[in-house]
């Protein structure tokens, strides 16, 4: 009887801890979604941001925002034990997997764009043409969808007929009932990460060589591009570190349930949320043209409201004076 009571109290405490931590995450996710949304709005409002560099940045903002939202919904669903249909969970996890690959692949494309702009300035306009930009976006989404779609097809095929109408608490683990599928995903993602890291590394080296041989007036912009590539590399490493978090979760779960919860939330903040904070830093704050436009639209609403209030107060005073007259 006492053991049952203690177990019930322990489960209640764990459930309460999960909900409290998930509420903390909501505040951070809400702030980041607002900032990213404001940046996307700024991009859409200004025609000057229609070149390849800013288009890729806007895609990064969209993908990161969508990924944060999907990951956050998964976190809330796990904390509050919300059940959904298993096929809906498969689709949900497939979209989230696609976004999680699309984000670093877009970062690699942004590094390549900086390489072309700095090392091949005479060919930058032709390579970064609108047609090539659209083709590049299609390639990014095509490459990003290969692994998730394969996993979805295999998971759907191996799901027993009696489980097709079941309801589950949605997480990535639901899709990996077949052991070899999880191993294949881990191997393919690690291979993709190595390829992307090699591309970013070679881009960095070539830009660094160009920076040393650049003239005095070009050195500043070249070194700025170099710092941008470094930040993208940091984003890539932090983002892809999520590949090892499942193994950390398994190890901590064997030690203590509370340690598992704390480590899981720390991993979520460090490898899911923090890398998505770097995109606004890289472009939103460091790029003067975008920063000025962002600042204008961030405070424009306040100024507009003040103007409307002044106009309304003048109208009311005028109406009162006419009535008295």
Curated annotation (Swiss-Prot):
What InterPro entries does its record include? Answer: GPCR1_Superfamily_Member, GPCR_Rhodpsn, GPCR_Rhodpsn_7TM
**What keywords were assigned to this record?**
Cell membrane, Cytoplasm, Disulfide bond, G-protein coupled receptor, Glycoprotein, Membrane, Olfaction, Receptor, Sensory transduction, Transducer, Transmembrane, Transmembrane helix
Topological region Extracellular? 1-22, 76-91, 157-190, 249-267
SUPFAM superfamilies for the chain = Family A G protein-coupled receptor-like
Any one GO MF annotation of this record: olfactory receptor activity
- How would you describe this protein's topology in the membrane? Multi-pass membrane protein
What disulfide bonds does the UniProt entry report for this chain? 89-170
Q: What are the TM regions of this chain, as residue ranges?
A: 23-43, 55-75, 92-112, 136-156, 191-211, 228-248, 268-285
Q: Name one GO cellular component term.
A: plasma membrane
Q: Which residues are glycosylated?
A: 2, 6
Known partners and oligomeric status? Homodimer. Monomer.
Q: Which family does it belong to?
A: Belongs to the G-protein coupled receptor 1 family.
This protein is called Odorant receptor 131-2
């Amino acid at each position: 009887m006492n053991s049952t009571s203690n177990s019930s109290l322990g489960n209640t405490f764990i459930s309460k801890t999960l909900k409290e931590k998930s509420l903390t995450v909501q505040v951070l996710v809400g702030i980041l979604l607002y900032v990213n949304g404001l940046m996307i709005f700024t991009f859409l409002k200004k025609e000057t941001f229609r070149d390849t560099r800013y288009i890729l940045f806007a895609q990064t903002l969209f993908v990161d925002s969508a990924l944060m939202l999907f990951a956050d919904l998964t976190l809330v669903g796990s904390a509050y034990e919300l059940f959904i249909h298993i096929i809906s969970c498969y689709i949900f996890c497939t979209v989230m997997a696609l976004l999680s690959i699309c984000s670093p692949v877009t970062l690699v494309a942004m590094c390549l764009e900086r390489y072309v702009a700095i090392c091949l300035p005479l060919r930058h306009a032709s390579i970064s043409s609108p047609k090539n930009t659209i083709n590049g976006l299609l390639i990014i989404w095509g490459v990003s969808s290969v692994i998730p779609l394969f996993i979805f097809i295999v998971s759907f095929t191996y799901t027993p007929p009696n489980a097709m109408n079941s309801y589950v608490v949605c997480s990535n683990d639901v899709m990996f009932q077949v052991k070899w599928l999880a191993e294949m995903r881990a191997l393919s993602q690690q291979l993709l990460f190595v390829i992307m890291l090699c591309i970013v590394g070679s881009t960095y080296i070539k830009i660094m060589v160009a920076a040393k041989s650049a003239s005095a007036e070009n050195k500043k912009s070249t070194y700025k591009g170099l710092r941008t590539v470094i930040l993208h590399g940091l984003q890539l490493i932090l983002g892809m570190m999520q590949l090892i978090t499942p193994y950390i979760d398994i190890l901590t779960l064997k030690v203590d349930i509370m340690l598992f919860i704390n480590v899981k939330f720390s991993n979520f903040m460090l490898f899911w949320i923090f890398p998505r904070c770097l995109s606004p830093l890289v472009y939103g704050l460091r790029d003067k043209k975008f920063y000025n436009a962002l600042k204008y639209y961030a405070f424009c609403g306040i100024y507009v409201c003040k103007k409307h209030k002044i106009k309304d107060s003048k109208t009311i005073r005028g109406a009162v004076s006419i009535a008295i007259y």
